[in-house]
Amino acid sequence: MIKPSISLLTYAALSASLSLTACGDNDKAIETSQSVAEQLTADKNSAIAANFVSQASDSAAHWLTPQLLVLPKSNDKLLYQLLNTNKAAFNGITLLAVDLPKELAAKFPHLSDFQAYKVELSANEAKAWLKQQLIVVALDKAQQVKKVSFVQTGAVIDALYTQGEKDADEVADLGATINEQGVSFKLWAPTAQNVSLQLFDENLQAIADGKLAMLEDSHTGVWHVQAGKQASYAYYKYQVDVYHPASKQVETLMVTDPYSLSLSVNSEYSQVVNLDDEITKPDRWDNQQIPTVKNVEDNVFYETHIRDFSANDKALSNAKFKGKYKAFSEESSDGIKHLKALQSAGLNNIHLLPTFDIATVNEDAAKHLDIDDSLGKVCAITPKTSICQQTYNEKQTIRSLLQSYAVDGEQAQQLVSELREYDNYNWGYDPFHYTVPEGSYALEAKGVSRLVEFREMVQNLHALGFRVIMDVVYNHTHQAGLEPNSVLDKIVPNYYQRLHPLTGDIEQSTCCDNTATERVMMAKLMTDSLVVWARDYKIDGFRFDLMGHQPKDAMLQSREAVRAVDSDTYFYGEGWNFGEVASNSQFVQASQLELGGSEIGTFSDRLRDAVRGGGNNTRDSQGLGNGLLHFANEKVSEQQSIDDYHLRMNQLRIGLAGNLANFPLSYDDKQVLGKDIPYGDQPTGYALDPADTINYVSKHDNQTLWDNSQYRLAFDVSTDDRVRMHTQSLSYTLFAQGIPFLHMGSEFLRSKSFLRDSYDYGDWYNRVDFSKQHNYYNVGLPPAAKDKENWPLIKEVLAGHEGRDQVSAKHIQRSSEIFKEMLAIRMSSALFRLSSEKSIIEKVSFLNMANSAQQASGLLVMKLDDTVGDVVDENYQTIIVIFNSSAETQTFKLASDSANDALGYQLHPIQQNGTDEVVKQSKVTAKGFTVPALTSAVFVKKQLANR
């Protein structure tokens, strides 16, 4: 029992009018003829309210509809009161237990075992109550306070403001909109007690007479005001008076607009802007040609980071473009020349890591650090840095200091770690404002300049022949509560963020403050934002970070809205199943297993782990791409290798077949389907369409493909063989059905010096060399915060490899050329890019299976057959791809009843005429195909004239 700090007599006085009745077996709450609050006197309101609030132990009460609230079930016979702790009028009503309606149990499955209570309030009364602090008090028969809970209100806000006609989710012009009269401002803030608008000039000084009171539309919860024409292109903020659970009091908060379209430096002020205005557009913006693809499966994605792309490029025409949007306007920088070469080979999509406004890079260049800044600037900005406590050369650059450190030492990681808070680097998964380009990538971050520069980048990529994909992060915000970079949670507290169902704490499973896209207005914000990027910035598709934390329905509805302005958009993302929403516990997720058949792509960890190896103990778990069975390292037993090998090979086969759930495999004299092959406790195959599957073996997360392999490779593998294993790993992605996703630099052996999570560790660990002279392997131990536990293993493998893991410029260039040839092979035939489940099942087969007569260890033989079904390739009737991951040249012999089937095949012309001298040793005989070690060879048979 919670002991009250005020006397029991006070409680008795409060409860004198309670009419107690016996509770039956149905465990209904004690009924009352009057509420506790009806007997309160005004002068006691504040003290009593404060006392109740001080005893609150959780936030387990959920107000779902105006007439229904739920609480965790209790065996105690208690009286529950919903109290509104408004100091002016302390109000309360008794809650009567009722059955939870089936439709609400289905809508809120994580609350389905809670007890429901009837709330006797009208819709208008409920709206008024939501503007105050709410608690539920539980009293026993002796009028003792047993429990006090705060109330979660997100669901009832949706019920009141989004489920009728012409309500909040149908308001089409939230934010600032320039119109004939001036500027319309609209902010959805249904729980706010008051909202006003403050305008600022270009110097961010408050404009005289620029504070305007806003009025609330009680039907929508939208506060609005019409300002004059002087507000056009002005900066602005909202002043919001709102009860905030973080402080448990009414706060007066100055906040930017969640629907901002332009911002000041460091996003401190929103700016009014019209994205149709010519001043926001580069020349010829409206007349540009946007590349298209015939089928979704024709896409090939190349994942870039705007700073990584050019920060290390020594061939820029202007050094100021380093790490900026402007670098994509270059014509002959090393990066642009490489992109042009990839485009010629068939690359058609540039995927940009987050480019919306983020909170973790200071946009004022004078206040952030660049790797080429001097130590003098370092010590001026952050004087407590350890290097500043020593004798140092003020003119020496950060880069040159890092270069002076021993590569096997800890100094580089220590310096980078100390400076990361102040440098100009971050991946960008720290959303501040969802619908404004990030300012740190612009030469001028203030106002419309960043908008123009972003559009120039998109326009230039389109002109190079690329579609542009944007990485978006609607699953969390950088901050919430009353923190400086909180926006949404200051306007409608505890609505936009997903809360723990009992504690009310903001869930953090994504990394940060999770958003609740199951809430209608959070889903609307996501959708409205996506439409702006697609319509006004001509973004051609979107990759969704931690998409599995969002409802499937919200994703489908967002795609429908984006398709209305861009019919050939494509959505894909991370469909991982984890956290508080795992296994559809709160809603049907946009996860791998749920999105089958939707043509929203999900990253496949199945093919990835088959190739890279899995597990946390990296050296103990090899993959097919780094020596499993055929180049076993000292940690892996022979039996483990054999067992892992057969499973990994079948997982890879399903991956090559688009990860289809229903793809048939003949295995051990029986036929199984893709969904029957295990991947841990889940099926390997889950896709119902090839567009459901994104294949990859490397991306920004985790170690690069090169670094991952060095962790796992046997020590005696030669440098040349390491490069071949690397390019063969990429071949699985490029020759698979589904859509390939390629990490920038993976084609030329990119390393991050073993760093598994480089999100905020600067240019030193994230460098890319498009001149192909260096892959930046082993440039210092990775930062301790991420990899200290791996340091002993890193030192062990570096010593064991004895330099065989160090590549030359020739290795880097050779890898890049082989990659381009494999990419060109993929794009040479639609047989690699089949567009339906039916066509894959018809045309794709594997000619050797584990435990079959045709099995040869180390060989995987895939046949793409255009002699069945509709013709998709005018050039080739059949393609056979042989992946030889063994250490020896091997021959695949066809079955005896098809002895002449190899006649008419030849090595693909691109490989015949390419730079890989090893693959050219592949041979075709009447009875089969001979392929060198560590080689992916493609054999083609020309299409018959009558086909």
Where do the protein language model's features map onto the residues?
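Active-site-proximal helices and loops of the catalytic beta/alpha 8
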Residues: 204-206, 210-217, 369-372, 535-540, ...
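Substrate-binding/active-site clefts of carbohydrate-active enzymes
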Residues: 307-312, 316-319, 326, 341-348, ...
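Loop/helix patches that line or flank the sugar-binding groove of alpha-linked glycan CAZymes
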Residues: 677-681, 685-880, 885-892, 899-901
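Short proline/glycine-enriched turn/loop motifs at strand-loop junctions of beta-rich domains
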Residues: 72-78, 189-194, 886-888
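C-terminal motif of bacterial Sec signal peptides marking the signal peptidase cleavage site
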Residues: 20-22
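Bacterial signal peptide processing site
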Residues: 24-26
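The feature marks proteins involved in alpha-glucan
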Residues: 30-32, 36-59, 103-184, 220-224, ...
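C-terminal beta-strand-rich structural cap/linker in extracellular carbohydrate-active enzymes
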Residues: 189, 233-236, 921-947
